[in-house]
Regions:
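Intrinsic disorder at enzyme termini
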Residues: 1-14
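Catalytic cores of phosphodiester-bond-cleaving enzymes
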Residues: 1-2, 27, 41
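Internal helix-loop-helix
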Residues: 4, 54-116, 120-121
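Buried hydrophobic positions in well-ordered alpha/beta secondary-structure cores of metabolic enzymes
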Residues: 15, 26, 57, 64, ...
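An alpha-helix initiation/capping motif
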Residues: 16, 43-47, 96-97
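Short secondary-structure junction/hinge motifs that connect adjacent elements
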Residues: 33-55
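Glycine-rich, Trp-frequent "lid" loop and neighboring beta-strands that shape
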Residues: 69-70, 110-158
Length: 158
């Protein structure tokens, strides 16, 4: 990926192929009626679509090969992110990719060996909690509660 003289992103051939398949996938999986339904759903994303993204290898694009990823680097996720934004495809892709980058760049060997394969194969995903207008809260409390095989996270920020 390069930036041309007119400040436009120019994708590599590999990124162009990812962009083409991502646009088609996101367009097909993200009809406006589906987006609206997901807003009201319990988990906010379609697990079948998530599983298809796993099968396409998209969760491991930026994860090193030794941990089950493709090792293509964070730049390989840009075409996918562009397509997901264009078509409003709701998944935990962004937060999971960011969590994987955190482990890859700053994790201990034990953390990398444990978490990166799970994130690459879709067994685990990450959340981004951006609810409400005040993203600059000074403090917060959070409680996670397990019940009937589900984890409920609740909290308060101020």
């Amino acid at each position: 990926m390069n930036i041309a003289a007119n400040n436009r992103l120019v994708f590599s051939e590999e990124q162009g192929m990812i962009l083409d398949s991502a646009r088609e996938f996101c367009r097909d999986k993200s009809a406006i009626s589906a987006v609206r339904a997901l807003l009201e759903s319990e988990n906010g994303f379609d697990e079948a679509v998530w599983q298809q993204m796993v099968e396409l290898g998209w969760l491991g694009l930026a994860i090193p090969e030794e941990f089950g990823g493709s090792g293509l680097g964070i730049g390989a996720t840009v075409p996918l992110a562009e397509s997901m934004g264009r078509y409003l495809l709701a998944t935990p892709f962004f937060s999971t990719t960011l969590a994987a980058q955190l482990f890859a760049r700053a994790g201990t060997s034990a953390q990398k060996n444990h978490w990166l394969p799970l994130l690459a194969n879709g067994t685990r995903a990450s959340l981004a909690l951006l609810d409400g207008e005040d993203w600059g809260a000074k403090a917060f409390t959070a409680t996670a509660e397990a019940s009937a095989g589900k984890l409920t996270l609740s909290g308060e920020k101020w």
